[in-house]
Amino acid sequence: MNQNIGIIIDPLDSLHPEKDSSLAMIWEAMNRGYDVIAFYPENIFLKNGMPSATGILLKKNLKSLIKISERSLWEGSLKELDLLFMRKDPPFDMEYIYLTYFMDALENLGVRCINPGSSLRNVNEKYYISNFPNCIPPTLISSSVVQINKFIAQYKKVVLKPLDGMGGKSIFVINKDDPNRNVILETLLGDKRTIMAQKYLPEIKDGDKRILIINGNPIDFMLKRIPSKDDFRGNLVRGARAKIIGIGNEERRLCEKIRPHIIKHQLMFVGLDVIGNFITEINVTSPTGIREIESAKNINITKILFDEIESS
């Protein structure tokens, strides 16, 4: 009997086959003979204490992966799974947290989850970098207008971002004398919302670096995302340009710094974001970059990932 792999994922027709890391994982699983079932968050439920769902049983015809017929529907208890990937993109809101509770229940039934639900809750992608004060730029996490204004006054130019977002959404660069400062703070803070402020790093003009880490070990190549001329954000969805380069000694040093935490939280797949020599985020929910690196270099990252999963 084939083993079943589940994947909690965004709508399949919203994914780009040539770029999407989740699809790369699905294809690798299929090539290894796994049955792969895709689940949308709204179709997962807990009934009488049993995590269950309706999903889409994906077929081996990879070209038709995005257009699935109703005949491929799957329904049942999630305890039938051997492995579950969580690949739902943020925002990391209460609905996301509820999904991690489902994952907890599954793990109690012996189903392995990547990454584990408890770790997704405990390792907030932005907040968690505060555990490495010597490896990050000057950083403030606060909901206080007073404290944030003091931080802006001290560092003159800062980056402001919510703790629960992704893809460069709602990220602002603000100067000490910016006439829109109050409006930006009102927009971000809302009703005492906690945000992150970081000293602006001019190295972002040369690009930020996404380092993929599998079970604590970095991949030898990293994705450099160079912002467009009219945008400071190093996000491909915001127009940044991709460049694949070899990982350097400084990046390896940063990976070694966070490695014990990765192992402690059983984080099989992580995306580390670096600007200059500073960590800016530790992505654990749905790291991307596989397709860009694989298309440029002779490396099969999903094979490395599944080899590690199957041997650990």
Give the role of each language-model region.
Residues 30, 107, 152-153, 189, ...:
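Anion (oxyanion) recognition and catalysis
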Residues 13-141:
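Conserved N-proximal alpha/beta basic substrate-recognition cap immediately N-terminal to
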Residues 7, 85-86, 198:
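Redox-cofactor binding/interface segments in oxidoreductases and associated redox assembly factors
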Residues 9-18, 34, 226-231, 237-238, ...:
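Charge-biased, low-complexity intrinsically disordered regions
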Residues 146, 153-157, 167-254:
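Phosphate-binding site of ATP-dependent enzymes
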Residues 3, 15-18, 246-312:
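ATP-dependent carboxylate activation and anion-phosphoryl transfer catalytic cores
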Residues 134-156:
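Rossmann-like NAD(P)H-binding beta-loop-alpha module
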Residues 11, 88-91, 163-165, 287:
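Short glycine-rich anion-binding loops that position phosphate/pyrophosphate groups of nucleotides
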